[in-house]
Design a protein with these regions (language model features):
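N-terminal "arm"/small-domain region of PLP-dependent enzymes with the aminotransferase-like
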Residues: 1-28, 32
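Short beta->alpha linker loops
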Residues: 11, 32, 36, 54-55, ...
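Structural motif corresponding to alpha-helix initiation and N-cap regions
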Residues: 13, 35, 107-110
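Hydrophobic alpha-helical segments typical of transmembrane helices
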Residues: 15-18, 37, 84
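Phosphate-binding glycine-rich loop
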Residues: 27-74, 88-92, 97-100
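PLP-dependent aminotransferase-like
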Residues: 65-129
């Protein structure tokens, strides 16, 4: 059996201080730290606007909705993934198409992906196992 190591989070005193500062400010979600982070991300990406959401799940669903993906559409994702990769496809009314992984990498098989693409395929949600 091939074991996949997961690394512990890299949290330094600087991150702990930032979290404490945010908590002491009384703002947890939509406060000045969030607005500043959105501004910096937008600048980094070379765009005027960015928005923070509470999870990657929310981001995936919003992306599918912005792309206009819904009933009658197919979205391909990995069969080896967290539930969010597939559940967001169902939330927008599209049909999930699950692709098996390569045995050595546990990433979506490109050969299987190519075979699964149809005229109804509107997006692919790749999965980076282990982050």
């Amino acid at each position: 059996m091939h074991k996949i190591p997961f690394s512990p989070p890299d949290i330094t005193e600087a991150e702990i201080q930032e979290v404490c500062e945010a908590l002491r400010s009384g703002w947890i979600t939509t406060g000045p730290k969030t607005k500043e982070f959105e501004r910096q991300i937008a600048a980094y990406c070379g765009t005027d606007k960015a928005v923070c959401l509470n999870s990657a799940t929310a981001c995936l669903e919003m992306t599918l909705r912005i792309l206009g993906i819904g009933p009658g559409d197919e979205v391909i994702t990995s069969a080896y993934t967290y539930t969010a990769s597939c559940s967001v496809i169902c939330h927008v009314g599209a049909t999930p198409v699950l692709i098996d992984v390569d045995e050595g990498s546990y990433h979506m098989s490109v050969a299987n992906l190519e075979k699964a693409i149809t005229p109804r395929t509107k997006a692919v949600i790749p999965v980076d196992i282990g982050g």
